[in-house]
Amino acid sequence: MVLVDSSTYQLLQWHRFQNYYPSKDVKSTEPFYYEALGITPSLKSVKEKILRKGDHPFGNLPIVVLTAGNEKDLGYFTASMEHDWQSFQRQLSKTSNKSVQVNVKNSSHFIQIYQPEIIVDSIYDLIKKQPG
């Protein structure tokens, strides 16, 4: 599995991040936006799985966590937000015994746009390492 600057289940605790949002309107609508898209329930199931299975909920599943090297390019990311995001990315990289985190330098959140070759290479490397 290749995760591209992915959100983590901790982001369900959106109230922890409400001071990060640039406007009051975003703060009030953001949770409803995700609920309307059906994203929140899927994140809740991931959280439950992680809490149930302990340190490595995905066992030996090979996982590559691609982390943007510069979220500040988004314009609204503060140093505190960047610190939290990097912490969440590190936590994602610990969900499997066979996971690795790759810090994609000179890339903002949209790695798939700015450095798509990193994603392709990561997928290819995972496939190459599989037996048979």
State the predicted function of each range.
Residues 4-40:
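Flexible "cap/lid" loop of the alpha/beta hydrolase fold
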Residues 7-9, 69-72, 107-110:
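Short, solvent-exposed loop/turn segments at secondary-structure junctions
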Residues 12-17, 75-79, 114:
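Short aromatic-enriched loop/helix-cap "lid" or pocket-rim segments at secondary-structure transitions
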Residues 35-55, 84-91:
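Active-site nucleophile elbow and catalytic-triad environment of alpha/beta-hydrolase enzymes
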Residues 59, 65-67:
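Short beta-strand/loop motif that positions the catalytic acidic residue
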Residues 73-104:
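Conserved loop-alpha-helix segment in the C-terminal half of the alpha/beta-hydrolase fold
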Residues 97-132:
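Catalytic active-site module of serine/aspartate enzymes centered on a nucleophile-bearing elbow/loop
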